[in-house]
Amino acid sequence: LISVEKTMVAGDAVFPAAATKTPKSMNQYFFAKVSFLRQQNDGTIKKESEQYLVDAMSFTETEARVIREVGESVRDLYFDSIAHSPIQEVVSYGDTDLWFKCKVVYKDVDPDSGKEKKTTLYILVNANDVNEAYDRCKDHLKSMLVPFEIPKVEETAICEIYQYEKPVPAGYLKR
C-alpha cells in the first residue's frame, strides 16, 4: 500500500485513508494487575497482588489470557487494573525473573516538517541488576543506525510476560 495524501492506493484500487488505517505497531502490550488470596506456609490467608505484561490486541483478550494462564494456579482472581503499556519491545535472556524498563531516546527527522525530533522507545529487558539491564539494552540496539542514548533504566514489578501465541488449528499438534 502506498499512502497518497488522503487516499490509500493498492494496485488499481483507491480507498479513503480512514478506512484502511493500520496499527502503529504489531506488538501491543497491556499491563494487567491482579490480586488474589494465597495460603501462606503457616496456614494463614494473605491477599497478594501481581503485575503481568500481556501481548494482546484488546483489553478483553488481555483479561482472557491472564485468567487462562494465572487462573490455573489461583482460584479467586480479581483484576485491579488493565492498562495500555508504553513498552514496545521485550528482550528476554531467560536467566532471571527481574524485568527492567529502559527508556531509549534517538533523534529522527519529521517527514512532514523536515525538522529533527526526539523519539522515545521503551524496551523491557530482564537482567540481574540495573547495570546489566543497561548493557543488555545497549547490546540489543548496537545495530541501530542512528545514535541513541539510554537516559533511564528502572526495575519493574512485572512478574511474568505472556507473549502472543499463534492459535493452533484443530487437528494439529503444537510443537
PLM ranges: what are they?
Residues 4, 9, 14-16, 21-30, ...:
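Intrinsic disorder/low-complexity detector
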Residues 1, 58-71, 129-145:
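A short, charged, amphipathic alpha-helix used as a generic interaction element across diverse proteins
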Residues 28, 35-40:
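Hydrophobic membrane-targeting and insertion signals
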